[in-house]
Amino acid sequence: MSGDSRGQEFTVGLFAIGLDTYWPQFEGLQQRLTGYTQQVAHRLEETGVRVINLGLVDSPEKAETAGHAFRRHDVDLIFLYVTTYALSSTVLPVVRRAKVPVILLNLSPSAAIDYKSFNRMGDRTRMTGEWLAYCQACSVPEIANVFRRCRIP
């Protein structure tokens, strides 16, 4: 697919956000969110674009590294997949360094959480981990506000 008038391949960056402190607390959550991110990457690739998938960015340090990686790969656009709650400090360094437009993906793993199964779990830690797998919308207002304040389109 030709992405611009120069005939070069259109390249999109993809990264997902999470919070590194969650992984040791909630068994399987990191792997689950990584799997969802892979699904998004495959869907993007089906459109014919080149996808630079940096996976889960879950700390400010990884955010800085991701921003540099997107610049190095000369991405034309970034898809930010909000997989669960995360801090704006895991987002802002990426988009500031990349200096390209960003599309927020607020996608849920399914149409709704299965509350019947959820309420039968009986273990509050497992329940919280399950809830976090459906917590995409939690961070979107914070991210949108940070983008607005920093004038990021």
What are these regions (language model features)?
Residues 1-153:
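An N-terminal assembly and electron-transfer interface module characteristic of large anaerobic redox
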